Design a protein with these regions (language model features):
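A short, small-residue-rich loop immediately preceding and capping a beta-strand
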Residues: 1-5
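Zinc-dependent deaminase
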Residues: 11-184
């Protein structure tokens, strides 16, 4: 059996995956990376080894950590994985903040909307929200719309990240102007 992340060893929404692997009689398990979640963190691997299963850990670890980057960031840094997204002209400029300017093309809009569909929340600054009135939903891709968050003077980034962590939101995409992006 090949898995990108260590099988869980605790009861949560589902029974432990490690127990299922043991009961199914699997002889060998190849694990890409260890689960950083405190309730697992090596215990799943130990459960398998205690049952006599041959376990190899760290195969394609870098690639597996990339696949699980949102989950891993959540459990190692106690905040969501953050994606900074902006559109700029070929000569490196953002829009002028006076008129909403469409810089993105159809393909980049699709890519942006895919990122939105894969993210739990989306954040823009107050100025962007007021001037551009962005929809911040998913239209050019299939998937759920992320939670909309507007950064204002009354809210700090740390408070937003703490709330998202508490709610187990694993990813945040920031689509702000220059000052919002610089805040991260």
């Amino acid at each position: 059996l090949y898995v990108s992340l260590e099988p869980c060893s605790h009861y949560g929404r589902t029974p432990p995956c490690a127990d299922l692997i043991v009961t199914k009689g699997v002889k060998r398990v190849v694990v890409g990376c260890i689960d950083p979640f405190a309730r697992v963190s090596g215990r799943g691997i130990q459960r398998l080894r205690d049952a006599g299963i041959e376990v190899r850990v760290g195969v394609l670890e870098r690639e597996c950590r990339w696949l699980n980057r949102r989950f891993i960031t959540m459990h190692t840094h106690h905040r969501p994985y953050i994606i900074l997204k902006w559109a700029q002209t070929a000569d490196g400029f953002l829009d002028d903040h006076y008129q909403p300017t469409m810089i993105s093309k159809a393909m980049t809009q699709m890519a942006s909307h895919r990122l939105r569909a894969e993210s739990d929340a989306i954040l823009v600054g107050r100025v962007t929200a007021e001037r551009d009135k962005p929809q911040l939903n998913v239209r050019h891709w299939v998937g759920p719309a992320p939670e909309r968050i507007v950064l204002s003077h009354s809210t700090t980034i740390d408070a937003i990240l703490e709330r998202l962590y508490t709610e187990q939101r694993q990813s945040l995409i920031v689509e702000g102007g220059a000052s919002t992006l610089k805040s991260f």
